[in-house]
């Protein structure tokens, strides 16, 4: 099924609806639904509420889809927004947009969850938020999208998946404190991590 672009804005309607649904879950539905469920204390509702929190370590819940869905939507919208710049001889205009978006998302992430406005280095977290993950993924994907053919985009994607899978599988263990990603976080970010 093809989802038409809006004739007024040129935006993909299905992507905007999905973005709205994800924001609705994050900002309204989950907080209100959880507060209501705690107030009413219905046993059948507790089973549903269980899905609106993250799993502590191993497992999967519905709420674990919210952040990856934002990353997916960012990536899905990039070919539409970058198509007019792909073959442009001077890409400086799009680079300015990419850098501006990266910096803004990163700073907003530090404000929201990184305690940036607290101005206390002991409680400052440099990389602790979905917005920062979106910013970093956006920057990397933008560079790949603007400079690589579709064939190389697929190849780079497969290589990145492999480069992530190998250390996660063969180095460290599968405990919260012993997995490879946790070790890299401790090494690179040190005290500035959430």
Language-model regions: role of each:
Residues 2-90:
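N-terminal signal-anchor module of multipass membrane proteins
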Residues 32, 80, 145, 149, ...:
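Residue-level marker of positions within ordered structural domains that often coincide
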Residues 34, 38, 42, 84-89, ...:
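Transmembrane helix-loop junctions in multipass membrane proteins, especially transporters and channels
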Residues 37-60, 115-128, 175-194:
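Membrane-interface interhelical loops and short amphipathic "cap" helices
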Residues 150-194:
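Long hydrophobic alpha-helical segments that form multi-pass transmembrane helix bundles
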């Amino acid at each position: 099924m093809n989802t038409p672009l809006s004739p007024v804005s040129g935006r993909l309607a299905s992507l905007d609806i999905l973005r709205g649904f994800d924001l609705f879950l994050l900002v309204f539905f989950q907080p209100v639904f959880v507060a209501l469920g705690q107030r009413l204390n219905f046993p059948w509702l507790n089973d549903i509420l269980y899905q609106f929190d993250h799993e502590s370590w191993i497992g999967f819940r519905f709420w674990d889809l919210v952040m990856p869905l934002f990353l997916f939507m960012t990536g899905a919208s990039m070919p539409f927004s970058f198509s007019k710049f792909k073959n442009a001889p001077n890409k400086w205009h799009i680079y300015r947009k990419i850098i501006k978006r990266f910096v803004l998302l990163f700073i907003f992430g530090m404000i929201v969850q990184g305690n940036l406005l607290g101005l206390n280095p002991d409680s400052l977290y440099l990389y602790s938020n979905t917005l920062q993950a979106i910013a970093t993924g956006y920057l990397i994907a933008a560079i790949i999208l603007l400079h690589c053919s579709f064939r190389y985009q697929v190849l780079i994607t497969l290589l990145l998946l492999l480069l992530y899978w190998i250390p996660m599988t063969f180095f460290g263990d599968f405990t919260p404190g012993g997995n490879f990603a946790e070790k890299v976080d401790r090494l690179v970010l040190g005290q500035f991590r959430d």
